[in-house]
Amino acid sequence: MPCHEGLHPLVPNFCTVTSPMNSSHLAPQVQGLYDPQNEHDACGVGFIVQMKGKVSHDIVEQGLQMLVNLEHRGACGCEPNTGDGAGILIQVPHKFIQKIAGAEGITIPAPGQYAVGNIYGSPDPLARAEARQKFNDIVAQEGLKVLGWRDIPTQNEPLGETAIASEPFMQQVYIARPEGLTDDLDFERKLYVIRKLTHGAIRSPKIDTYWYVASLSARTLVYKGMLTTAQVGQYYPELHDPDMESALALVHSRFSTNTFPSWERSHPYRYIAHNGEINTMRGNVNWMQARQALFESSLFGEDMAKVQPVINIDGSDSTIFDNALELLYLAGRSLPHAVMMMIPEPWSAHESMSQEKKAFYKYHSCLMEPWDGPASIAFTNGKMMGAVLDRNGLRPSRYYVTKDDLVIMASEAGVLPIEPERVAKKGRLQPGRMFLVDMEQGRIIADEEIKQEIVSQHPYGEWLAANLKSLEQLPSPGNVPGTDAESLRQRQMAFGYTFEELRILLAPMGRDGVEAIGSMGADTPLAVLSDKPKLLYNYFQQLFAQVTNPPIDSIREEIITSAETTIGGEGNLLDPRPESCRLIELKTPILTNEDLAKLKALDDDEFKSVTLDILFDPNQGEAGLKTALDNLFTEADQAISQGANLIILSDRQVSAEKAAIPALLAVSGLHHHLIRNGSRTKVGLVLESGEPREVHHFAVLLGYGCGAINPYLAFETLDGMIAEGLLVNVDHKTACKNYIKAATKGVIKVASKIGISTIQSYRGAQIFEAVGLNQSVIDEYFCRTSSRIQGSDLGVIAQEAILRHQHAFAPRPGDLHTLDVGGEYQWRKDGEEHLFSPQTIHLLQRAVREGNYELYKQYAALVNEQNQKFFTLRGLLDFQDRESIPLEEVEPIEAIMKRFKTGAMSYGSISKEAHESLAIAMNRIGGKSNTGEGGEDPERFTWTNDQGDSKNSAIKQVASGRFGVTSLYLSQAKEIQIKMAQGAKPGEGGQLPGKKVYPWIAKVRHSTPGVGLISPPPHHDIYSIEDLAELIHDLKNANREARINVKLVSEVGVGTIAAGVAKAHADVVLVSGYDGGTGASPQTSIKHAGLPWELGLAETHQTLVLNNLRSRIVVETDGQMKTGRDVAIAALLGAEEFGFSTAPLVSLGCIMMRACHLNTCPVGIATQNPELRAKFTGDPAHAVNFMTFIATELREVMAQLGFRTINEMVGRTDILEPKKAVAHWKAKGIDLSTILHQPEVGDDVGRYCQIPQDHGLQHSLDITQLLDLCQPAIAKGEKVTATLPITNINRVVGTIVGNEITKRHWEGLPEDTVHLHFQGSAGQSFGAFIPKGMTLELEGDANDYLGKGLSGGKIIVYPPKGSSFIASENIIAGNVCLYGATAGEVYISGMVGERFCVRNSGVNTVVEAVGDHGCEYMTGGKVVVLGQTGRNFAAGMSGGVAYIFDETGDFATRCNSAMVGLEKLEDPEEIKDLKELIQNHVNYTDSAKGKAVLADWEASIPKFVKVMPRDYKRVLQAIKKALEAGLSGDDALNAAFEENAKDVARIGGS
């Protein structure tokens, strides 16, 4: 049945994608590709608490001041005076309430005996009066009494037009506490019930659409709105009343990706303020909704039904988190307990966690999956104030404790001016850790103490031992199915196996336990456009994290991931009992045949399984499939009613008479059927199927609710491959083990791409978009999945299954059972179609070599004429007939080509010759070439020839690996591109195999020759939208003349992300298609991640226009752009600049061997091998000819359509129309109306970029003070010294000065030419990219990203004079210091946060303690840590060396030893160098810790542990060997490379 029918009475309809009424007035509803549900936000959060609970007005004022100092973490939209939201939560100010309510004639009882509510209401007095009366009636029905109402005075003069136009009326209500409610929480529970009832009864078009209860409590009060941080105190003048007293203030500044008004999405919420994003939200909501049917609570009693639905599904992720936390708290758990359930530590592989605590987390994982994602959450109930950080430590949180009992925590240090002598401690929140101030006890309760009290409340370990069963504990049945060799080929055909899948996908999984790696992009048709029957999985594309939240690093940060999961029936979340964990524990969701046999045999009081066939009669077509599904659902209902708590769906009995129901259809259909029935959590779903075999299949099945999967035919296929010699040197058992390992790691990687760390949280999360499925199929079987172009219905799905079945069971001799060739991954005759076929490649190469436009037209015709064979969405579009104009009236080719770019292809992935040819070609035509993420040889910046050519790439890319990103590199850019994602592998980092890291590549990348490089999946300085704004600001400081470009990949919601990018002041946003090329990527990503650019581009343009942001930003697109027609359609959909990658490479000679990752390119393009590079025959003129032909064809189209300029074309979707009479058996159901939608906005709204972004550099410390101060050094190299104050709002200090020095002095200046001494708390990115000759000395503390991209400068940080705390035990600098630093020195007297020296490739530094993930991905430099490190030190470290002063002798337990060895210090020269570094540290910082180490140096030496990358050590030894053999310089390095690169399979130790 459809989503909206037959719902269990306690399970609200959450399948409907949109709510009937948008929560924000004036905000647009769903239209075209825009959907308000895709909005994201991020922010700054902070609190101040008087630890002893003493109330004062000072706390409120300091909270407001803190808010103003977090202004740069919020945002404004198209109006500078309309904020995204800000607010403050305080304790109920009794003195003020008594005074102000008394003036209204309202008698207020004693504190705690009444509640206060701040409520948004309608500006219409009549609607407001009706709403108040309804509220009063409901309160009375619940046995409580309203004491009265008052209007809250507001001042809206400072607000922008948008905020005023949607402004609610602010009102306050008072409710008396009845005598019967003696317990404080009983009163809060009743207020919760009232709030839920009144929301449902009042918030509607009939009464009051503005109605929203910001807070209703006897303890806390919230003032917030669609305000800037400074406007909070202005809008609510009563906040400045001296009687407005509190012992705590929780504040929040919001940054939304949209500009649409939303008063209620501002924070704080009732219990939390949140900085970050919950990545698992879809799954969390699905499971919370599914659990509601089982909710019972002795504390709520009959009121339980009144508070449902618990979750506001139209709210933001923060709203929903607050909803769930509130329920768990009010249903009986303490607030810290509820937080531990929702945001658990990464406990399963924690080497030092107690068994008692692990038992707590394991027990609660049986009740609820983690709410996972980057999060710093502050929480309060008015009596305690706490904060917790996500398991990955992805948001910053710093705190001060003062000697006069104040606790100040915020996203940054320095948000309030505190005299150094008042500070008792400076600290930070740590990953997964909790921080709690209990005002009743008057103290800070440490993480260990809080959690120990909670984990010891029940004997969780005993409960688990008695009830939770592992697969290993289950008895082994005797009969386990094996391989049926005789029918294997026929069954493979029935499930659509191809020979290509065996060879390319399954072989590396079975042989090596790894996913298959491929290269180039996907140029085959979408599943809905293919002539061939496709598996249903292929209609689903993986979504991924970009900008608003980061992907997770499942390789280097494996310690925070988990594949463990449970299956079975859940209990009541609100009434935990020993038997609540009566489940079966799985180490991986991929089951062997033996595992499944154990589950099938279960039949007792604890566990009962039932196996249901998922088969249908192929002769009955669609009706047969529909009937079989309905019968399956009925059988499942019956099984559950008879006590089954495990349902196994099986297609093992497939036969000539019975075809297999597509497994995904059966799993997801049943999952959603059971949710609708309210019985989903009573049962676990297991699949036994011959259909799934690759990572994507498993990921989609798990994402749609499957608990475990037995891919029995894949196991049999591995056996068959061994027998046929396709798999060698491995037996069947090992092959199956390897296969499960590859599949499990692959699924974790897919989950990590969206920022999810555990398979448990990924299950049921539905993080996919359907491309080409009809809405009726979505509503019935895949509720709440986006499917924006419609497409195939159930009839087509049935037809595809039947075609496979008929092909397998057609009468033929047994020896004619041969698998289809495939052709998905490489072009094959009779295989799947490819846009780049041998014919199109040959024609294009002839055309560009001969300069023959007529040959190009033949090539373009083959690509463009997709009437018979559809490939792409643009192939389904036609131009409407319009009055043409003469060709000479169209803007010239030269003007058009200035809009052309080549895509980001790194020096390393392609050869020097190919890379430079593209740069020369694009510079000739006035376009732009892109360095890619591998940096650029500085020699190219000034190279020229007699023709005036230049090899300097106009676009310098900044990717997560920061390879080659220096002050000089950035200074030579016309455009700097931040690579957030790549079309071929969004959510993953770039990858360069070790055999391609030749010495000349390693030199440019500042890495080790022969050692593979994998960039981190996230930018470690971009975990949210406000972080991106910071990097944009940093890079603009590093080169004020360059445009800043942000590269995104098309996915649902990319439009709202692009709006956030525009608000973050990017100059250009690039929306790449999923089909873009790559030098190396998992095949799963190449095929199944991301969406066509047509969808992403259209959504981006529509959303930017709706937000009135389109005129502020250039929109670019790329991805399989091959012809002028492609460019024309891109312009009409909203782009004004265009990128090409694969086609220019083909122009230069690429023949699409798709072996770029192997370094064996036969035409010298995708290789570093000198012998193969010699075969390169390309010429810049070939690429010039290609671009000229594209522009020529485009001009012809423009003349045909009557356009004189590109600007006139941008966004003119009214010129496009779907092709008429599409007869394709699948494509005929496609609806492109959403892509062609035109937003209805006024003529004053720009449709292309016309207004330059205001980067606000004129307000920076560099511009206002430092540039003039340092002019003698910049101009003449003279020494400059100065002392200046600094605060947290002074960001990127020194970077503009550094850029000016670099532009004049490429090699920098002599040491200490500029020496600036700052006093205070430095803002983010202090000293970013500063070159040699600059020294920044900071007396105080620093926030995140200190020394980012340091390019030779020196940074010194130490506590203020007068500080009494011990520096080495306090946080002095924030997270991600020295990210991507390439040269220089840094000395920090104190502790630093997480990810210190991530991707350091040349800086020498001394610090006194570091957080988790220190020296991650480091490739060069020296790091000295004179104290403790966090966990996972040296993960991915392939170069440089670290020295750890290991006083406690346990450093080895916190070091990731995958790529490094731990050694003792023995070399006298090395010991001398180390001592000199520490002595420098003491000299610069006066470090007490450094002095202590040096004071007893001989005793200190044995305590140092040297962390040495094994790859790096091997290279050094090889160089030494080469030098001893008489080689020198580059010859020695090349010899070392040849020696080191013999192990060609290694990729950076992975």
Swiss-Prot record:
Belongs to the glutamate synthase family. [3Fe-4S] cluster binds at C1150, C1156, C1161. The keyword Acetylation does not apply. It catalyses: 2 oxidized [2Fe-2S]-[ferredoxin] + 2 L-glutamate = L-glutamine + 2 reduced [2Fe-2S]-[ferredoxin] + 2-oxoglutarate + 2 H(+). NCBIfam families: PRK11750.1. Pathway: Amino-acid biosynthesis; L-glutamate biosynthesis via GLT pathway; L-glutamate from 2-oxoglutarate and L-glutamine (ferredoxin route): step 1/1; Energy metabolism; nitrogen metabolism. CDD domains: gltB_C, GltS, GltS_FMN. This is Ferredoxin-dependent glutamate synthase 1. Gene3D superfamilies: Aldolase class I (3.20.20.70), Glutamate synthase, alpha subunit, C-terminal domain (2.160.20.60), Glutamine Phosphoribosylpyrophosphate, subunit 1, domain 1 (3.60.20.10). Its cofactor is [3Fe-4S] cluster; FAD; FMN. Binds 1 [3Fe-4S] cluster. InterPro entries: Aldolase_TIM, ET-N_metabolism_enzyme, GATase_2_dom, Glu_synth_asu_C, Glu_synth_asu_C_sf, Glu_synth_centr_N, Glu_synthdom, Ntn_hydrolases_N. It is an enzyme of class 1 (oxidoreductase). FMN binds at residues 1097-1154. The keyword DNA repair does not apply. PROSITE patterns: GATASE_TYPE_2. PANTHER family: FAD NADPH DEHYDROGENASE/OXIDOREDUCTASE, GLUTAMATE SYNTHASE (NADH). One of its GO terms (molecular function) is 3 iron, 4 sulfur cluster binding. The lineage of its organism: Bacteria, Bacillati, Cyanobacteriota, Cyanophyceae, Synechococcales. Residues 43-440 form the Glutamine amidotransferase type-2 domain. The active site is at C43. GO terms for biological process: ammonia assimilation cycle; glutamate biosynthetic process; L-glutamate biosynthetic process. Residues 925-948 are annotated as: Disordered. Its EC number is 1.4.7.1. Keywords: 3Fe-4S, Amino-acid biosynthesis, FAD, Flavoprotein, FMN, Glutamate biosynthesis, Glutamine amidotransferase, Iron, Iron-sulfur, Metal-binding, Oxidoreductase.
